[in-house]
UniProtKB/Swiss-Prot annotation:
Component of the Mediator complex. It is found in: Nucleus. Component of the Mediator complex, a coactivator involved in the regulated transcription of nearly all RNA polymerase II-dependent genes. Mediator functions as a bridge to convey information from gene-specific regulatory proteins to the basal RNA polymerase II transcription machinery. The Mediator complex, having a compact conformation in its free form, is recruited to promoters by direct interactions with regulatory proteins and serves for the assembly of a functional pre-initiation complex with RNA polymerase II and the general transcription factors. GO terms for biological process: regulation of transcription by RNA polymerase II. Its main location: nucleus. Gene3D superfamilies: 1.10.287.3490. Keywords: Nucleus, Transcription, Transcription regulation. GO terms for cellular component: mediator complex. This is Mediator of RNA polymerase II transcription subunit 11. Belongs to the Mediator complex subunit 11 family. Coiled coil: none annotated. GO terms for molecular function: transcription coregulator activity.
Length: 115
């Protein structure tokens, strides 16, 4: 991988890291809203959950592209173990987050709308 490509790749991964932080802030905002003494505002929770889900999908796509591009520059043709393992770990983590988010959505849907 030439230095220019590597630098660009690192910048894209830095952007992903920033998006992950934003996603965690969204999740924290939803948790605070759910804990609100006056009850959660359904529209607030729904919009933040939608944004969370879209961001997670975007992050997953970006990470897959980065893993694929890293594999294209690998020195040994069949040496993709690290990339495959990293991809599998990320995939499992995203599945877990999506499951938790679905549970959160179901919980939020049980509360009456306070609009």
């Amino acid at each position: 991988m030439d230095p220019q490509t590597q630098n660009t790749s690192l910048q894209r991964l830095q952007n992903v890291e920033n998006r992950v932080v934003k996603v965690l802030e969204l999740a924290g905002g939803v948790m605070e809203e759910l804990a609100s003494p006056s009850g959660p505002k359904k529209e607030f929770v729904n919009s933040h959950c939608r944004e969370f889900m879209q961001s997670m999908k975007d992050i997953q796509v970006t990470l897959r592209e980065e893993i694929k591009s890293a594999c294209e520059y690998r020195p040994f043709e069949k040496c993709d173990y690290n990339a495959r393992i990293a991809n599998e770990i990320c995939f499992q983590k995203l599945e877990y987050v999506l499951t938790q988010l679905e549970d959160l959505k179901q919980t939020a849907d049980r509360y009456p709308s306070s609009d």
